[in-house]
Design a protein with these regions (language model features):
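Feature recognizes metal-dependent phosphohydrolase scaffolds
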Residues: 1-668
Length: 668
């Protein structure tokens, strides 16, 4: 029978390495005590968002407000003493300190009035900050403080008043801050600290990219966030493939941005050179009827000149035909994708100007294909090849894009499990009978969790496999499959009907049939089976994005008897009319799990000026019988293992198996 001593002997190599950080019994014991204390703190608040679709202003607002958590803290601290309109102003100040602060200061008619406002605001912010910091150790709070004013903020947050007057003490410090012209900076720092401490973990359940204007701003903010994970959406993986240098993914990304007149973001923010594409497009398509290629526009982002729309439309057509050629090539290379029916350039009858889709032929809305050779429709002409070479070079050399995609790989995955919640963007592919769908890739069968794991691994191959290798090519092709493939867990539909929507007037060809998963996820038994597949008890939750919930038609985001929650963020403006809302977010605190329903967001400028918020409803999904502590979480499991290792280290010191550093602290 193995003893504890046997286990310590087996772990001696690891414990010796651990002793570098804790070179004495005193150091190890001190860490054990602080870690065991941490286990008894309340679980940190988790914030779940999904389907951001590049809508940076709405994202920033929901991030800053933590889906209403910040306002709840303001009301909790000040609700009995401060009028509602002042609390709304204070909440907006916390959301947007740099924008709101000048407005509030401008209302002060005199220096004395400004000093009074500074005093009241600083004291209120300190009280709110004390509340949100109560879930954290003092050491953690200190680590979040800015170096320039950290000592003073630490004093304000952690001072004790058993034997001296609180008002006098605070009054002296706050008065000195104002007198020395540092009030603005302290207000901004307190606002940022409140937002930092209010949410412990941010989960982004896919689709940072799409048609929205500034996905780059979203990624810049996420890269600065203190604790975030990402579950890839199908819009994300196609950008990941583009950054890896996949020609088909590059064309797909460009097709989407041009379709929504958002290519300026690629040029200005990522430094992508579209000059060669524009020149080729004008050469071959400049005189065409471009009516079906005109971009979707948003009046709020205009105005648009006729020349701007023409340039966008002509590039849209050029890149689309290039994309359809490359799709034929990818389908040829990957018969296991089972997409042979979607090589549409080969299914055109060039004499009749029709295309065969399934068993029927349909007339083409645009019959001009000057770069397509009917004898070899998938072949690129020299001009197209040059454009593609330049685009691949531009995407690969974009430093900012590479930084963003490396971050998506480092923080992202196909699915994520944390604290009993299973997070994924799209679907776990299923059959019509409600069983996990099975697919063969590279000679092996995959379904359920194994399919998700395979997708994750092959997606990483597309970026990290050696340049020029077959593995890298295979991985990049698969990133495109994850974007639009029938059994892609990130897509969850029968087909991406891009060609049909462009070229065929008959809307019956535009249908994208949802995976049976989206029927079966209403069944509680199926949701429990999915949870079990990922090693979770049936009482836990699935957090899903991807599919907008049509609330105005009576659809509920809560599926499967409460086991699954759809939180498509509804950030995409195009969906608001269909859904009746601007989507959902989820908040999981130490006491409750709550679904937050949002109304459409107009603009940050209006939110700052009018103290507007966009949360309209809070729906409690689950209330805990007892407050969840850190020891009840996944982090708690890691910390308990750490305590176990540290106790073994102490024993190893006591046995003389590891030499202890000299310690002057005789308490131990």
């Amino acid at each position: 029978m193995r003893t504890e001593t046997d286990e310590i002997r087996d772990n001696l190599k690891y414990l010796t390495l651990l002793s570098r950080d804790y070179p004495s019994q005193a150091a190890a014991a001190s860490e054990i005590i602080s870690t065991q204390a941490l286990l008894k703190l309340p679980k940190g608040t988790e914030h779940f968002m999904s389907d951001l679709h590049g809508e940076n202003e709405a994202f920033v607002h929901i991030l800053n407000s933590a889906s209403g958590v910040i306002r709840e803290k303001v009301d909790q601290v000040l609700g009995d003493t401060v009028p509602e309109n002042i609390r709304a102003e204070l909440a907006t100040l916390i959301y947007y300190p740099n924008e709101k602060l000048p407005q509030l200061k401008a209302r002060c008619a005199s220096e004395e009035a400004l000093d009074q406002w500074y005093t009241e605001t600083l004291l209120r912010l300190i009280d709110i900050c004390r509340l949100v910091s109560s879930k954290h150790t003092r050491e953690h709070v200190r680590s979040c403080l800015p170096a320039s004013c950290g000592y003073i903020l630490d004093e304000l947050l952690h001072a004790h008043f058993e034997d001296h007057d609180k008002d006098l003490y605070y009054g002296q410090i706050v008065g000195s801050i104002i007198e020395n012209g540092r009030a603005d900076r302290f207000i901004v720092r307190l606002c940022e600290l409140i937002k930092h401490l209010a949410v412990d973990k941010l989960h982004i359940v896919g689709d940072l990219f799409d048609r929205g204007p500034r996905p780059d701003i979203i990624l810049d903010l996420l890269m600065r966030h203190h604790n975030v994970d990402i579950q890839w959406g199908n819009h994300d993986v196609v950008w990941m493939g583009a950054a890896a240098g996949s020609p088909i993914c590059i064309c797909t990304v460009l097709k989407t941005t041009l379709a929504y007149h958002n290519h300026g973001m690629l040029e200005d923010c990522y430094g992508i050179n579209l000059r060669h594409l524009q020149r080729m497009a004008e050469q071959f398509y400049g005189e065409d009827d471009l009516s079906i290629w005109m971009p979707h526009t948003d009046a709020a982002r205009g105005p648009y000149t006729e020349g701007m729309l023409h340039r966008c439309a002509v590039m849209h057509k050029a890149i689309s035909i290039l994309m359809f050629k490359l799709e034929c090539q990818v389908i040829d290379r990957n018969p296991d994708f089972q997409m042979q029916g979607r090589d549409y350039l080969r299914r055109i009858d060039w004499s009749k100007h029709t295309v065969r889709i399934g068993e029927k032929e349909y007339p083409l809305r645009d019959t001009s294909f000057p770069t397509v050779d009917p004898a070899a429709p998938a072949a690129l002409n020299p001009d197209e090849q040059l454009v593609l070479t330049k685009l691949v070079q531009s995407f690969r050399q974009s430093e900012k894009m590479q930084q963003h995609v490396e971050f998506l790989y480092a923080k992202g995955s196909v699915y994520h499990i944390e604290n009993g919640n299973l997070l994924y963007h799209g679907a776990v592919p299923m059959t019509g009978r409600g069983t996990f769908a099975t697919e063969r890739f590279e000679g092996r069968l995959y379904s359920g969790r194994a399919l998700m794991d395979y997708c994750d691994a092959r997606a990483r191959r597309g970026y990290y496999a050696p340049e020029g290798s077959a593995a890298r090519q295979s991985g990049q092709d698969f990133l495109w499959y994850l974007w639009c493939g029938k059994l892609s867990p990130l897509f969850g539909r029968s087909a991406m009907t891009t060609f049909e929507r462009l070229y065929v007037a008959d809307s019956s060809t535009h249908t994208e049939v949802k995976d049976p998963y989206y029927t079966w996820y209403n069944d509680e038994a199926v949701c429990r089976r999915i949870l079990a597949e990922f090693g979770l008890p049936g009482s836990n939750h699935i957090v899903n994005g991807h599919v907008p919930v049509r609330e105005k038609n009576g659809e509920s985001p809560i599926k499967g008897g409460g086991r699954l929650v759809v939180i498509d963020g509804g950030f995409c403006r195009a969906y608001h009319e269909k859904t009746g809302i601007a989507g959902y977010t989820l908040v999981y605190s130490s006491r409750t799990m709550s679904l937050r329903t949002h109304q459409p967001f107009e603009s940050a400028e209006k939110a700052v000026k009018e103290n507007l918020d966009i949360i309209s409803q809070k729906n409690i999904l689950e209330t805990e019988n007892h407050r969840i502590l850190v020891e009840d979480t996944d982090e708690g499991e890691v910390l308990r293992e750490r305590v176990h290792d540290l106790k073994q280290l102490v024993t190893a010191y006591q046995l003389g198996w590891i030499t202890e550093a000299r310690c002057e602290d005789h308490i131990w």
